[in-house]
């Protein structure tokens, strides 16, 4: 069997890999974006999107069109495509696709807790959640007053339970604790997903490990930068860093000691690809933000996943590229709706 793994890969997964590569061919090109940024109204945008693989996905929407409606329909289309693949997947691809949804579940839980903290109703918050991360117990999140209650009453029967072990405490849920929970969940999630991919091995591990290593390192950089000027201690900050990136262990130890942005940048200098990202970012008008530089690098890594065949990385890469495409379209739509065209070109090109 080990001599021709691609033969056995295709038995269970060949149809879906062919499907996802076909869907990837419909990702918007640079020429499509050049057309979109020339639109004067959202109706023009709708018309241009009809000539792409999006087709008439906005056909049933009444005028006047809004950015939030476009955003909702983009997510719906992406979720329909993803669920079709999940419904036809055999193990271990089914578990791999489930792992992709867990990050959206984490974001949804945090959004609901934060909204509840600010006295927003659950009925108002649930529509704002990402449909790829929906789960049955979501609407009960508002009853939890502490992380322990959140776990015991709601999350214990969800896939997130495995990531929640380090978050359980009797402290009240305030904004600082919620951010700590978010980052602790993501740390456990990324480390678990990384371990799963290494166990799958082969081309899947070759494609996915660099992507997840970058995601872990990006979170470590952002956690460090966002912690400056807050009450978060250096010891607590270090506990939030995922240990599956290229920064582990020396880089993370240096980030744990960092006191300002320059010291974070000095850590990045030891890693050539991260050094380039920090050097290309600035805070002056016209400069790209560090977040944009991270998004660009993420797109580059996800595109690389399509260079090899017979692996699961293409499914993750497709979802992330579509997610970036949705952000791009919404950004352009916002600029058109607000008549703020000066920054309309600040999207992240994909192809």
Curated annotation (Swiss-Prot):
InterPro entries (UniProt xref): ATPase_csu/dsu_sf, ATPase_V0-cplx_csu/dsu, ATPase_V0-cplx_dsu, V-type_ATPase_csu/dsu, V-type_ATPase_csu/dsu_dom_3
Protein's cellular compartments: Membrane; Lysosome membrane; Cytoplasmic vesicle, Clathrin-coated vesicle membrane
Modified sites of kind Phosphotyrosine: 270
An example molecular function term from Gene Ontology annotations: protein-containing complex binding
Keywords in alphabetical order: Cilium biogenesis/degradation, Cytoplasmic vesicle, Hydrogen ion transport, Ion transport, Lysosome, Membrane, Phosphoprotein, Transport
Principal location: membrane
Gene Ontology terms: biological process: cellular response to increased oxygen levels; cilium assembly; intracellular iron ion homeostasis; proton transmembrane transport; regulation of macroautophagy; synaptic vesicle lumen acidification; vacuolar acidification; vacuolar transport
One GO term describing the cellular component: membrane
Function: Subunit of the V0 complex of vacuolar(H+)-ATPase (V-ATPase), a multisubunit enzyme composed of a peripheral complex (V1) that hydrolyzes ATP and a membrane integral complex (V0) that translocates protons. V-ATPase is responsible for acidifying and maintaining the pH of intracellular compartments and in some cell types, is targeted to the plasma membrane, where it is responsible for acidifying the extracellular environment. May play a role in coupling of proton transport and ATP hydrolysis.
Quaternary structure note: V-ATPase is a heteromultimeric enzyme made up of two complexes: the ATP-hydrolytic V1 complex and the proton translocation V0 complex. The V1 complex consists of three catalytic AB heterodimers that form a heterohexamer, three peripheral stalks each consisting of EG heterodimers, one central rotor including subunits D and F, and the regulatory subunits C and H. The proton translocation complex V0 consists of the proton transport subunit a, a ring of proteolipid subunits c9c'', rotary subunit d, subunits e and f, and the accessory subunits ATP6AP1/Ac45 and ATP6AP2/PRR.
Protein's name in the database: V-type proton ATPase subunit d 1
Originating species: Homo sapiens (Human)
